[in-house]
């Protein structure tokens, strides 16, 4: 608490008070644009970026959109976990400038010496800031399993290098997915119990052995690209079974009247489905495991979390109105169009891609409109951050 007392008060614009304020709108705007740009390139209506099309697509969805969300979330959460003021002001401005520079570099400068710098400054700086917070204030950390982030965060640098490495693209993609999966496993474990307590007055049972096994298996599966096929399949199926078991005794059925909480469970079940599908050798249309995770887990959970955090952390009551629920509904349609319908009607694959891209973009455009006024204004309860 002493550290917070001597921290100078930020007197600049409210946008720079805490990490989610600049990065959630940036992530939402990126998510609204990226699928439409991708479909424009995919269909030949737009010029291709400097990187190979598939590499650019995967990089921007994970390291553009995904890391803006994860970075904003962790910059906000870590300060609360260790009870300090956290990074704000100039530090956030530098991060945003680096993120914007990376978007331009990925499109225009892929493969050039300048890209090696501009394409990595954001990730390196973000990791350094987050790890500094977790290591410097580990004695006041309320979550002793935050050592998982000390493992996961630096591995994003390895995963990104592999993703951009040409012949190692699939290794990098799978490592990246495993790292995001690990982050979502931890986030769901920490957020669902208080959400269920607040919405339904339910105290979810915590079984240490199961919780620990889930995180341990998720960490092991980060290294999927280097695991023997049989071991990967066994670990994936065991983790899927444990997650389904926990969702069952965490009363997933009770969430149906509350869409904003139900999508959290649905996102977790999509993660489980991704594990099961990736454990099999069956052939599916359109990189199914990757899109189960991107549309199912990231797509369903992130919009709900953005709204919840943008309202709750600006001093407002967390209530999802009709427009918020419309955004979540649009993402559910996008999920069906991208994941389910290509398996049912593969002849219309490109049409389903367009439907999915448009619904995803509409969802995040609406989310951007909803949260922008909140992050640009001071807290309504008089608190600083």
Please annotate each region the language model reported.
Residues 1-385:
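Hydrophobic alpha-helical transmembrane segments of multi-pass integral membrane proteins
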